[in-house]
Amino acid sequence: MKKSLLFALCSLVLSACAKNEWQLVWSDEFDADTLNTAYWNTEDNARGGGNAELQYYTPKNITMEVHPVTGEHCLVLNAQREDYKNRPCTSARLNTHDKVTVEYGKVEARIAFPYTADGLWPAFWMLGNNLAKNLGNDDSIDQQAAQLANEGRVVWPKCGEIDICEMGHHFGIENGIQDRYFNGACHWGESFNNGAYPNIGMFRTEDYPVQGDFHLFTLIWSEDSIAMYLDQDKYPEVKPYFQLSLRGKQINEPGHYFNHPFYLVLNLSVGGFFPNMPAAEKYPEIITADDPSFQRVTALPADGTPVKMYVDFIRVYKKRG
């Protein structure tokens, strides 16, 4: 009994010390009735990041709502079936490009991801702030690299990408573990090069569902490493689900690309390569409800009821001292 009590007290002390390491430098608690556009850019396009996604991203699918169970005021990304600008469904994506950036420190987000079922691909991630605007993951833009360099901008993946959490991968669908299967990832390199760029993704099957309810996703990023954690608030000693050394600083080594400011991205995709439900073309002009991949999407109710991704807060910390 005494040993158990001593262990519990030590755990509390360690947790308190860990919290005191960090100083909050920015947050969005999403308590207002409208989105703070001093922080956030909303996207209005059907590009889908070069991933053959099926949705149209529109600002109307971004709302501020009270969570029906917990009562927290949240940012909400909505995905739904509807014919809209040559797409069979709509959803939301927003970012802090050139408004809020992070370079090293800790990033936390408390998110209730929707049940992805078959077809949803939600994510919380980051891109290098030096990425040229309105280009995204387009392998056709490498030819513009020289011009962009003169403007201080680069193309993907030279900017670097940090995926703090993604859900909806086809392995989870194929094995019936969609609600417990997720990943962290990093992408980098000098050019897209037909997909032959350096990257690493680490997938995890959790013991409990990570969809439907709120969970805390944490990135800890230093000059030497990147690490990602699930539910560190509940389990302070939890091991990271993703780790990457940044000690290698040469071209095509990760440390060469994750040493500058990054911006935040939230999105709720429908279809695409990740869940193995891509459109027939990478950048199609028209996708209809008869598209074979869209026919396989089970996550969106037939009556057009939105599926919701709730974000309670995002917080950025720097180490004290």
Where are the model-predicted features located?
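GH16 jelly-roll
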Residues: 18-321
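Bacterial Sec-dependent N-terminal signal peptides
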Residues: 1-21
